[in-house]
Amino acid sequence: MADESPVLVEVEAGVAVVTLNRPQKLNALNAALWAELDRRVEELGASDAVRAVVLTGAGRAFCAGADLSGGDGRRSATQILESYEEIAKRQLRLWNLPQPVVAAVHGYCLGRGMELALWCDIVVASADARFGEPEIRDGSFVASVIPWLTNPQRAKLLMLTGDTITAQQAAAMGLVADVVPEGGALTAAKQLAGRLAHLPSGAARAVKRYVGAVQELQGLVAAQKYGSALAALMRSLTAEELGIEELVRIREAQGLRAYLAARDAPFAR
């Protein structure tokens, strides 16, 4: 019987492999997955036996983003802000892990899933990986780490168009450290993490703190707080205010698949 936990953890030779485990939903992030991932991250951070971490996804994708299957409901602006602030805190906890964290990305890596990968220290992607942040097409956006990993023009191009890009394109932008053949991301990430696990732990932590301090001096953490508030404001607007009434009608009448097709059609290249 398959393990039903939304997050699986295996530790071998000092390397913890953390697997997002909702393959039937392309590992889309729901409340249960977020909570379990956060709990596991805290456990790993306190473990002396773990010297490096690999984050991956079960099945055909790393993570397709936030789980949209249940709709967003009609939450208040305050509730949305609290939710987004909690997500930001969880991303920062992953970023602040004392151990090096390597993301092993295959298949879809979109929206919140893309951000999850980019908050890791190093991203290894297989050639079939696809990255993107399509939320802009819904009248929203994600408070992103992308502007700290590439130049502002490229960040705006990706975030404004909502386009999906290949692993090779992501590497050219500085979002991915290494592209490996299809099916090879997890193996390559585990090999890299195995090498990192041999580092003196104090030295590895010092490097992480140093690079993190540079990003903080560039405003990363403060911008996440501002971005979370701005994203929550956008999410709290009505369909009429966002100008997406027709898309909402399509979703209500025809379902999520039809909604996504109608949303993305004007952006086809």
Specify the residue positions occupied by each region the protein language model found.
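C-terminal alpha-helix plus adjacent terminal tail
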Residues: M1-A13, T166-A167, T187, H198-R269
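Conserved CoA-thioester-binding segment of acyl-CoA-metabolizing enzymes
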Residues: M1-A58
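Terminal peptide-recognition signature
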Residues: V18, R22, E36-L37, L55, ...
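A short, glycine- and basic residue-enriched loop/turn
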Residues: P23-L26, R60, G65, D128-R130, ...
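Charged catalytic carboxylate motif
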Residues: A32-E36, E86, R93, A188, ...
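Glycine- (often His-adjacent) and acidic-residue-rich active-site loop
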Residues: A49, G57-R93, C109, R249-G255
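Crotonase-fold acyl-CoA enzyme core
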Residues: L92-A204
